[in-house]
Amino acid sequence: MWRIWRCRLSFLFATGCLLGALTAGLGSQMSDSVGRNVQAPAGVADASQEAGDVVEERTERTEQQVFALGPPRRHSSESLFPRNASVTARRRRNRRIALIATAVGVAVILAALYVLRRRRAQPPQEPEPPTRLRTPRPRAPSGQQQPSESEPPAGVPMTPGFLTLPFTCLRDTKVTFFGPSGRQHGFTALYDPSPNKRVATVDAGTNRLFIGGGGMNGEFANTIIEEARRNRIPLTATELSAESQEIQERLLRDAERRPGTLVEIDSGRFSRVFARSFAYVAIVPNTVWDESETGKNVGATFLHILKPEVTPHGNQMNDVMLYTVAPLGNASDSAYNLAYKATMLGIVGAVSEYNKTPWGEVKPVEAIRLPLLGAGHFRGRRGLHSIGRANAVAVEAAITRFDPRVELQFMYEPSDAALRGLMESERTYTFPQGD
């Protein structure tokens, strides 16, 4: 990309220099040509022969002016050499054109130099592939058949737009990577209209623990409010934001006092949105890392059972949502990786522990749909490749610890950083040695 910009700037610089030189020369050439075209009138050539007549004529005019009323008439050289008005106007116009063109050329040169200086001052960034690249499949261990593109794994419908792979480093957990959809920017839908399994979608929330605003958090709010409106339930964005913030702050206080334990409240008694709410904290925020680097409330995960009136598409297989907060990308690598791992432990731990509750035993969560956490507004200066590696390490740690037996579904992200990170972990994975 930098080479392309450098070629463009060089072309602009050369064009500006050439334009300035040409306009300066053009202005002087126009002035000279106009000067050469100004010729004396035909009567001037015979001025020496008619000099006597002219003197006599002036004498008569002087005598008439002496005896005439009013001020004497003035004479100028224009009486002998009349100036051509069209030639003078053309000369002035050409001078203006030359000055304007010269100024434009100088402006182009200065703009090119300014852009070149700004480009050199910016730090280099990691290139991001604009399209979804074909990536080789992980090598399956002996005795295990490796899935191919033409033959997806058993039980996976042959639908274009996603890829499902089992990963040995994740205890053969199936991971689905969605391709671009027909929606704006190719984003994956939060929930499917007719799902074949119960999916809990992760909301990449904010440090203040409310649902709403922009990005994915705002999309969750719009989905809930639209379902409420369809069922004639009065619910505004402000009310949803305040209600979700109050419930999640209350849950967080309980979860921080009992890390590693799923806490719950019967939110259905006072909430228009949530029938039941849970929270899980694997590592208490701000104990292992500094919140001034990562942001507040990182590592906490909230699991909500939505009421039927606000469930997406009105399908009860879509009535579970997860809410978490990703670390800020500008944090140091050590703090970022620890906080990211705690975030993934919170997500997988919350689902694993929920499936052991009476609610989960009746209607367990079968899949977790999540974005590449931290790749949006919280990304900062961190490259997507770095986020993909942190995600792979965190997912591997969470699956190894909880073994939730659920499918992971990564939403579409153009760089495929989640897929690349897990493929790298799969290549470097070492099989545990038997006794």
Curated annotation (Swiss-Prot):
Residues 1-20 form the signal peptide. GO terms for cellular component: membrane; symbiont-containing vacuole membrane. The chain crosses the membrane at residues 97-117. The keyword Aminoacyl-tRNA synthetase does not apply. Its main location: membrane. Residues 21-96 are vacuolar. It is a single-pass type I membrane protein. Residues 118-435 are cytoplasmic. Disulfide bonds: none annotated. It is found in: Parasitophorous vacuole membrane. Residues 120-159 are annotated as: Disordered. It comes from the Eukaryota. Keywords: Membrane, Signal, Tachyzoite, Transmembrane, Transmembrane helix. Interacts with host SAMM50. During host cell infection by tachyzoites, does not play a role in tethering the parasitophorous vacuole to the host mitochondria, probably because it does not bind host mitochondrial import protein TOMM70. This is Mitochondrial association factor 1 form a1.
